Amino acid sequence: MPTIQQLIRSERYNTKKKTKSPALKSCPQRRGVCTRVYTTTPKKPNSALRKVARVRLTSGFEVTAYIPGIGHNLQEHSVVMIRGGRVKDLPGVRYHIIRGTLDTAGVKDRRQGRSKYGAKRPKD
């Protein structure tokens, strides 16, 4: 505990909160162009080929974003929308690509949790 004299000498200062998704610049989503679409392997206990894309954003940042769902139609120069949200077992991946917007197609034959994958309601 500081004394009153110490508080008079120099006031308390609030610690700045560090944002978890700086490339969004306080926006909920950002548009960008894919510069590279590839697969990568996750951290130690897990094993898979995770689909990711390198995206150049309108804010000027170039970030790595995860492509959720089974199958995708993304390639270089595809225009995508990204949101925040990291992938725990992929170091450096702090953004998700939003399915069903701009050039990204929704997940085909998706029946549950459709809104998260941009899938329309099935006809049956």
From Swiss-Prot:
Biased composition (Basic residues): 113-124
InterPro entries, sorted: NA-bd_OB-fold, Ribosomal_uS12, Ribosomal_uS12_bac
Gene Ontology MF term list: rRNA binding; structural constituent of ribosome; tRNA binding
GO cellular component, one term: small ribosomal subunit
Domain of life: Bacteria
Keyword terms of this UniProt record: Methylation, Ribonucleoprotein, Ribosomal protein, RNA-binding, rRNA-binding, tRNA-binding
Positions of the UniProt region annotated as Disordered: 103-124
Transmembrane segments: none
Matching PROSITE patterns: RIBOSOMAL_S12
A Pfam family this chain is assigned to: Ribosom_S12_S23
GO biological process, one term: translation
PANTHER family linked: 30S RIBOSOMAL PROTEIN S12 FAMILY MEMBER (PTHR11652)
Function: With S4 and S5 plays an important role in translational accuracy. Interacts with and stabilizes bases of the 16S rRNA that are involved in tRNA selection in the A site and with the mRNA backbone. Located at the interface of the 30S and 50S subunits, it traverses the body of the 30S subunit contacting proteins on the other side and probably holding the rRNA structure together. The combined cluster of proteins S8, S12 and S17 appears to hold together the shoulder and platform of the 30S subunit.
Assembly and interaction partners: Part of the 30S ribosomal subunit. Contacts proteins S8 and S17. May interact with IF1 in the 30S initiation complex.
Entry protein name: Small ribosomal subunit protein uS12
Organism expressing this protein natively: Acaryochloris marina (strain MBIC 11017)
Gene (name only): rpsL
